[in-house]
Amino acid sequence: MEAEIQRGWKSHMNKLTIAGVCPLYNVLSAQYPFVESIITTLPLVDVLFVNDGGSTDGTLEILKRMEKRWPKIIVTEIPHRKSQFWETIDEALESLLRNECIGYDWIIEIQADEYFHPRLYEATLAEIEMAHFMGYNALRQPITTIFGWERQDTYTYRNIRIFRNSPMIRSMWGGDCFHFEGLPQNREGFTSHNLPPEYDSNILRHHLKDLFVNDRMLQAKNHAEFFATKHEQRKGYFNKLQATQYQHRTGNIIIHPEVPEIFHGLVGLEKYEVREELFEL
């Protein structure tokens, strides 16, 4: 039986189509390494719809440059009209799902403070293919937050960023959540998902804001205040993180071996800068 499953699964390989969706708004001024995040997502998708919600800080101009450089990137401009930040993400995602992602088999959502590790590309695609063949609708993945690599006492929860495309899926009410129309929302952390049946994945997804716990370039406190208002405990953890620095005895900042190479050039910067060499990759 297992051999038949494997043969059937492999017959689907290279046939599935995957669309990426990425909602952004003023991420340049928010100090998000969004260029690196987008680039590391491209190997997983056939197309990546990056939506700008009406940025006024130069984010859109950079996205337009990326669209010209990487054919997989398609920039959309769905304005963020609602007052609550999570509602604006939901509104943009809902529009992308309804209008841009038609015809693709699976969807991957990535945000400007997240990344998939390059060493997990093959495993991620294989897991999507297996989930597709076995009839699952989503991968519920662990995500690590707050303390990052150097501190292993991380706060973790499991949410969904990879799911089978369906006209019944909605992203509404609670912050980049995905659920089938008519089903209740099962909340975990401050994000809700409900796309049964779900596959319990072990492929870790990471927060960029936790990438360099020894680096002032990524201001974790700002992230908490902007995206986790009313979550005082989480905000306190981020404040603690911001005050913590890990340095080698020589004074040089250590780059943890698990940090993908594309992010190495950011370590030690006081402010996030879009590096021109990335457009030459």
Predicted features, each with a name:
Residues H12, I18-V21, Y25, G58-E109:
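Active-site-proximal specificity loops/subdomain of glycosyltransferases
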Residues L16-C22, T41, D46-N51:
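Hydrophobic targeting segments
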Residues V27-L44:
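Short, well-formed alpha-helical segments that are part of the catalytic scaffolds
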